[in-house]
Curated annotation (Swiss-Prot):
This is BRCA2-interacting transcriptional repressor EMSY. Its main location: nucleus. Residues 104-108 are annotated as: Interaction with ZMYND11. Glycans are attached at S228, S236, T271, T501, T506, S557, T1120.
Length: 1322
């Protein structure tokens, strides 16, 4: 036979000697094993071994060692026992005795002894809870590990949804028991049956095949195998689940780092809805990793919940959807890039990665298999970087699709910023669809939550480890510090807050709406969500309305400027959970939350408020579509990955924030998704403010899930200055609140958090302006995809970040005329992000603006294109109503204001669309604008804009549509107090937003509509916003509406000044009353009434909102200095029905703003040139004003000294402010003369600097869209209507959220206001 291969190999003598020795030793060992298995040692065997030892050169010591090995081998002992009976080891034992007995040694004492003992004891306890090994031998684990029959490959987009659909019966009977491995093969698993499909918790045991420790798929963070990596586990309610998991883990193809799916039957019971099963899938470097993780002790009810509903979509990086549970890599797939990107590729069946580490570490992440309807956010949180996925064990993705359960409870927010960790909601979500794929936007609100009973942290698919305690159990997965962790604090992991990537930097979840991981609320609409930015930007605490709705207690956490925030949630199984978020960036700083510190008392009706409409997943990055039921999810993307992550998820609104560090974060806020707990009560807001103060450097996006299925506008907490998670969405889920906190810096590395339910993707984009531009492009794409969601996203629209407002400011800096349209654009951008559904391209632009806002310097390059985008948005939004909200950087109180602002922005957005058209014109005019170096505001020389704005305002006031929403947010840190965003929100456009506002102020709305804004003021001294909001809805009915939101930074001392401000303000508002009247004859009749009505000033913990109804120029406008309260000088057209109530409201707001200002003090660094910013703001205001219903945003940075604020901006005393407001309101007719310019004088900390400067805010004539605005309002309100039902408190909460947003942006300094941007320019 011919030789086909060489007979001699090129082996050296040494190599041959080694191989020979190996063969000899193996042969001898094999012989001893065989003889030992035969039975006891006999004389013949002993002689045979003696000869063999000579032939094979085996020494006596080796002989004895091999014998000892054989004697101690339980396998050989068992065989010998069965073959030759008992007592077959005595001779062998004698033969194997050591010649020299070992000397007894002392127990070594080292530095690690205590730790080792603790681990050993924990292992012993854990093992004691496990069945005896003999009992585990004959499990019925049918592991057809590679059967691909049931589900489509995980990489397949969620749309298929058969297997993955949560809630829906498993695709096939096999599907229910099938785990789909990344390769696409499916493993059939018998799992405990789910008691209820929908909301009943199902108990399931998961056995760990691997060692304890982080659990869940410990997919390689990079998720090399995009498709195959994810394991989708549709689990039927069979008790055999754990066995199947083990078999699956064992049978998984090696291509993934060993992926183990383990179910511990006894160890944890997970409640899942119906058929959804939770499979813990771990792809971890070592296969042993999983088993311990899943331990009996852990409760997985929450996890299961998560699993069924949420499907993990791999983050941007990798297609694989698998959520990595392992500490380092566990969220890697789902969170971080892999999850985000996966969603599109992944089929409905997404791997549910529920990894449970040893009792303490158990994390379960589930991916809801594919409910095609539900929006998939990246099913898993997207980590900014693969490592972020790995970052912390806590970051397991637990996703709850909220698809079927629409109640906020079900919706879990996955904390975006860090790891978007979902607080595992108790049954509601979990019951739903365990397999639901994150990409499923509509039905499911996928959230990933990880619960651990003892030490487990629940991690959403966000990278950053964070700890969420859903129900009793939370699972924690350690994530690499890089990646954001979901809710639970992981050891150095950063929770992904807001943006998954950004969030990765910090753990963001906390009871407050912190949505640490990206997964939370993928599809959530921005409007409802509250996000707060702290100037320090480290942490943003957001209390989503959902949380408020839940009524859960929010524990504000003190956030230290650490990358990672730890969030501890006190799970209330069904009831709202309390989550304490501690943010520790990779640095590992931890913030301890104050348990019970924040309680959300206000229930917000988020359900139905907005839903994210499913948008084709795939093309656009991070496009997440979710229906109302879906929890909001925010996906944060690493700055590089932003676009990649979002492919499967639809993200409606996008926000791009530039971190102080120069990193850009893109926040994509899906409006449609419901963010139930956007805002919390003022008390909560204040608590948040305190928290924010502590974590001034931290920005956390908080999402809270509301038990109610309603969707509320999502508030984002953006911290511009820090690499805080840019976006946060609150998801209505089980009573879980997720807060996302992340640092900007961390963000870029690993902040992709995605809330399963909402399709919100935040992208962390490079901080460069170029990245901003690219981010904007990506956002535009996303927004285009999310345009559908725009209607749904109305409630979210209100969550517009100051950063977005700031973007225009940046543009202003760039170009005199450019800034003006940017100012509108800024508002619009937020709105656009929120109204992405309506105009994808335009909204994309707006999203871009927010990016600009974050970084003043960066925006300059993109400002021009952004402006164009804004113009587009304006055009597109002409039909859509948008309100512009300016958010100040104040961190805590901002929540409500932020919400309101967002709402205002959303309304303004429509106006801005019109005003965008004007804005283009104004762009030219803006060149003529002069920047007041001291005030930092642009003086408008173009009367046309002001006139048009005035006209709009004038016409609007009669309708009471004219509302000056003056939000004074303290930018104490940034000294942006001077920055006031005067937004003459065109209520027409604002109407969509107004629904939210109206929800808050519904009571006031009728009065406002009829006449009694004064009454609203009286009613809502504290919550003037409520009245404003209601007015906005009213205004929505009538096209011309002007909402002016003035965000002023102020200190408590300035509170009185705020009231006085109106009298003293040097603001020259030249609204063209005649024009306005001409624009709206109908509104003229109401003008008188509106004039009578006093601007409503809403006081938040740190937010002061003044709403002016009637025909007021949208220029409210005082930019207050740091110490003094921002004076809200409404245009002359302002109506002053009730000074006292207004004052009271103002005072409250001022107080709140003071709190925020304190918090914002850290933000201060971001804002370099407040005066310029003020100018920019003025320009923005001018732009807004131009539209018939103009939204004027005037941002006066806090450069001015408090004194200045007091003197210039407002009267010496708060009462003056009130009177001033009144006066302005009374003066509407006078204003028309000056209609073109609004003067905002910033008197504040930088009095000397700013006092000379006067800010003229010129309203950009916006084309009145009388019908449009009303219709838009009507259309947008889908979510907003529910908002209208909200109590005023709820509205205030929204406001708080808004404020928080604003504060965040203020932190960035660029973001807060155009004036900032302007200042930067100069």
């Amino acid at each position: 036979m011919p030789v086909v291969w060489p007979t001699l190999l090129d082996l050296s003598r040494d190599e041959c000697k080694r191989i020979l020795r190996k063969l000899e030793l193996e042969a001898y060992a094999g012989v001893i094993s065989a003889l030992r298995a035969q039975g006891d040692l006999t004389k013949e065997k002993k002689d045979l071994l003696g000869e063999l030892s000579k032939v094979l050169s085996i020494s006596t010591e080796r002989h004895r060692a091999e014998v000892r090995r054989a004697v101690n081998d339980e396998r050989l002992t068992t065989i010998a026992h069965n073959m030759s009976g008992p007592n077959s080891s005595s001779e062998w034992s004698i033969e194997g005795r050591r010649l020299v007995p070992l000397m007894p040694r002392l127990v070594p004492q080292t530095a690690f002894t205590v730790t080792a003992n603790a681990v050993a004891n924990a292992a012993i306890q854990h093992n004691a809870s496990l069945p005896v090994p003999a009992e585990t031998g004959s499990k019925e684990v049918v592991c057809y590990s590679y059967t691909s029959t049931t589900s489509t490959p995980t990489s397949t987009p969620v749309p298929s949804g058969s297997i993955a659909t949560v809630k829906s019966p498993r695709p096939a009977s096999p599907a229910s028991n099938v785990v789909v491995l990344p390769s696409g093969s499916t493993v059939y698993v018998k799992s405990v049956s789910c008691s209820d499909e929908d909301e009943k918790p199902r108990k399931r045991r998961r056995t760990n095949s691997s060692s304890s420790s982080p659990v869940v798929l410990k997919e390689v963070p990079k998720a090399v195998v995009p498709v195959s990596k994810t394991i989708t586990v549709p689990v039927s309610g069979s008790p055999k689940m754990s066995n199947i998991m083990q078999s699956i883990a064992n049978s998984l193809p090696p291509h993934m780092s060993p992926v183990k799916i383990t179910f511990t039957k006894p160890s944890t019971q997970t409640t899942n809805t119906t058929t959804q099963k939770v499979i813990i899938v771990t792809t971890s470097p070592s296969s042993t990793f999983v088993p311990n993780i899943l331990s009996k002790s852990h409760n997985y009810a929450a996890v299961t919940k998560l699993v069924p509903t949420s499907v993990i979509a791999s983050t941007t990086q990798k297609p694989p959807v698998v959520i990595t549970a392992s500490q380092s890599s566990l969220v890697s797939n789902s969170s971080s890039g892999s999850s985000s990107s996966t969603p599109s590729p992944i089929p409905n069946t997404v791997a549910v990665t529920a990894v449970v580490s040893s009792t303490p570490s158990v994390v379960m992440s589930t991916v809801a298999q594919g409910v095609s309807t539900s929006a998939i956010k990246m099913a898993s949180t997207r980590l900014p970087s693969p490592k972020s996925l790995v970052s912390a064990p806590t970051q397991i993705l637990a996703q709850f699709p909220k698809q079927h359960q629409q109640s906020p409870k079900q919706q879990l927010y996955q904390v975006q910023q860090q790891t978007q960790q979902q607080v595992a909601q108790p049954s509601p979500v979990s019951h739903q669809q365990q397999p639901q794929q994150s990409p499923l936007p509509p039905g499911i609100k996928p959230t990933i939550q990880i619960k651990q009973e003892s030490g487990v942290k629940i991690i959403t698919q966000q990278v950053q480890p964070s700890k969420i305690l859903p129900k009793p159990v939370t699972a924690t997965l350690p994530t690499s510090s890089n990646s954001p962790i979901m809710v639970v604090s992981s050891n150095g992991a950063i929770m992904t807050t807001k943006l998954v990537t950004t969030p990765t930097g910090t753990q963001a979840t906390y009871t407050r709406p912190t949505v640490s991981p990206s997964i939370g609320r993928m599809a959530a609409t921005p409007g409802a969500a509250t996000y707060v930015k702290t100037t320090s930007g480290s942490i943003i605490t957001v209390v989503p309305k959902s949380l408020a709705t839940l009524g859960g207690k929010i524990i504000s956490s003190n956030i230290v400027s650490g990358t990672t925030t730890k969030i501890t949630t006190i799970p209330m199984t069904s009831k709202p959970n309390v989550i304490v978020v501690q943010k520790t960036t990779g640095k590992g700083t931890t913030i301890q939350g104050l348990p019970g510190k924040n309680v959300v008392t206000t229930l917000l009706n988020a359900g139905g408020e907005k839903t994210i409409q499913t948008v084709p997943t795939g093309a656009k990055p991070a496009i997440l579509t979710a229906t109302r039921p879906i929890t909001k999810m925010i996906v944060t993307q690493p700055k590089g990955i932003g676009s990649t992550v979002q492919p499967a998820a639809k993200i409606i609104p996008t926000k791009i924030v530039y971190g102080q560090q120069g990193k850009t974060q893109v926040l994509i806020k899906p409006k449609p998704v419901t963010f139930q707990a956007t805002v919390v009560s003022e008390q909560t807001r204040q608590l948040v403010t305190e928290t924010l103060q502590q974590a001034s450097r931290v920005a956390e996006a908080g999402n809270s899930s509301i038990q109610e299925g309603k969707e509320e506008p999502q508030n984002y907490t953006d911290s511009s200055s820090s690499s805080t998670e840019s976006s946060q969405s609150s998801q209505d889920s089980q009573p879980v609140v997720h807060v996302i906190a992340s640092r900007r810096q961390d963000w870029s590395e690993h902040e992709i958090a995605m809330e399963t339910s909402p399709t919100i993707i935040y992208q962390d984009v490079s901080s460069e302006s170029q990245s901003a531009t690219s981010t904007i492009k990506a956002l535009l794409e996303l927004q285009q995809t999310t345009v559908k969601e725009k209607l749904e996203s109305k409630p979210r629209q209100p969550t517009i970040d100051l950063s977005q407002m700031a973007v225009p400011i940046q543009m202003t800096q760039e170009k005199r005329h450019s800034p003006e349209s940017p100012s509108i654009a800024v508002v619009e951008s937020e709105l656009v992000a929120e109204y992405i559904t309506t105009e994808r391209t335009d909204e994309g632009t707006e999203v871009a603006f927010p990016l600009l806002v974050s970084h003043r310097s960066q925006p300059q390059q993109p400002s021009q294109p952004q402006r164009t985008l804004l113009q587009h948005v304006a055009q597109s939004q002409t039909a859509t109503q948008t309100s512009v909200v300016v958010k100040s950087i104040p961190a805590s109180s901002p929540g409500a204001i932020t919400h309101i602002m967002q709402q205002a922005l959303s309304s303004h957005t429509a106006f801005t669309k019109h005003s965008e058209e004007l804005g283009t014109e104004e762009g030219e005019v803006e060149e003529m604008d002069t920047l007041d170096p001291q005030t930092g505001l642009f003086y408008r020389s173009a009367l046309t804009q002001s006139q048009s704005a005035k006209q709009q305002k004038l016409s609007q006031p009669p309708l009471e549509q004219t509302q000056l929403q003056v939000k004074t947010l303290q930018c104490f840190q940034t000294k942006q107090k001077q920055t006031i965003h005067l937004q003459a929100d065109q209520l027409q456009h604002k109407l969509p937003q107004m629904p939210q506002l109206s929800i808050r102020h519904q009571k006031l709305t009728p009065l406002q509509q009829e006449q009694a804004q004064p009454k609203p003021d009286v009613q809502h001294t504290q919550h003037p916003m409520v009245a404003k909001d209601r007015q906005l809805p009213t205004l929505m009915a009538q096209p011309p509406q002007t909402v002016v939101q003035v965000l002023a930074v102020k200190t408590t001392q300035q509170l009185p000044k705020l009231q006085q401000a109106p009298n003293q303000p040097k603001i020259y508002v030249q609204p063209q009353t005649p024009q306005s009247q001409m624009s709206l004859p109908a509104s003229s009749e109401k003008q008188t009434a509106s004039q009578v009505e006093q601007p409503i000033i809403t006081q938040g913990s740190s937010v002061t909102k003044i709403t002016f109804e009637g025909r007021q120029p949208p220029t409210v406008t005082k930019i207050t200095g740091g110490s003094s309260v921002p004076k809200l000088t409404s245009p002359v057209t302002s109506i002053s029905p009730i000074q006292a109530s207004e004052k009271t409201a103002v005072s409250d707001i001022l107080k709140m703003s003071l709190m925020e200002a304190q918090i914002d003090t850290n933000v201060e660094h971001m804002i370099v040139d407040p005066p310029k910013k003020a100018l920019a703001t003025s320009m923005l205001t001018g732009e807004a004003g131009s539209l018939p219903s103009t939204h004027m945003v005037v941002a006066g940075m806090a450069n001015s000294t408090p004194q200045q604020q007091k003197c210039r901006e407002s009267c010496s005393s708060p009462s003056t402010v009130g009177s001033s407001l009144t006066t302005r309101k009374i003066d509407p007719p006078a204003v028309p003369a000056t209609g073109q310019f609004m003067r905002i004088q910033n008197v504040g900390q930088k009095k000397a600097e700013e006092s000379p400067a006067e800010i003229i805010i010129q309203a950009i004539p916006q084309y009145a869209i009388p019908c449009h605005s009303s219709s838009n309002v009507v259309v947008e309100p889908s979510g907003l209507l529910e908002l209208n039902n909200f109590t005023s408190q709820q509205l205030d909460d929204e406001e708080t959220a808004m404020e928080q947003d604003i504060d965040s942006s203020t932190e960035d300094g660029t973001e807060p206001s155009p004036s900032q941007s302007s200042a930067e320019r100069s």
